């Protein structure tokens, strides 16, 4: 389907390093500084509209602080939002790493967690294991309890401008050896409505 094709294109060209990420200078600067200064938080909230690069940047951040693939866990909170799911995840945090300094837990759509899940997570955030980092990615920050927010460092992701989306479309069409005129690039960027993912449709 068209949806599958554009998702495949998005995944194929998903940034692998900070320098490949477009339009999130403030977010990247904060994260890069925390790595340089060795001031890494135990919990982060990455908030912003869909398709702005939250999960992508979370993965890059995990890699940049030296976590191996075996120590990076991604959970879709929309479909794993029960307290039992959270208990299993928290139990998992107690296990030692596979040789990395940190175990990273990326919770996508974190605002979808149930109240009891948030309560279970809160206890862990109050006394976090030394080698565990949580990254809560959300499009709905206001649905996350204030008690959770207060224990996380917040990183805001902004929707990319039309110009940045155009730049990304041109870069990818060049790599795909496809010629595309400027009017089409502009139209595609506008239809993307501030989302890198949607602008590759």
Task: List where the protein language model places each region.
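Extended polybasic, low-complexity segments that bind anionic RNA or targeting/receptor surfaces
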Residues: 177
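Short secondary-structure transition/capping segments
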Residues: 55, 193-194
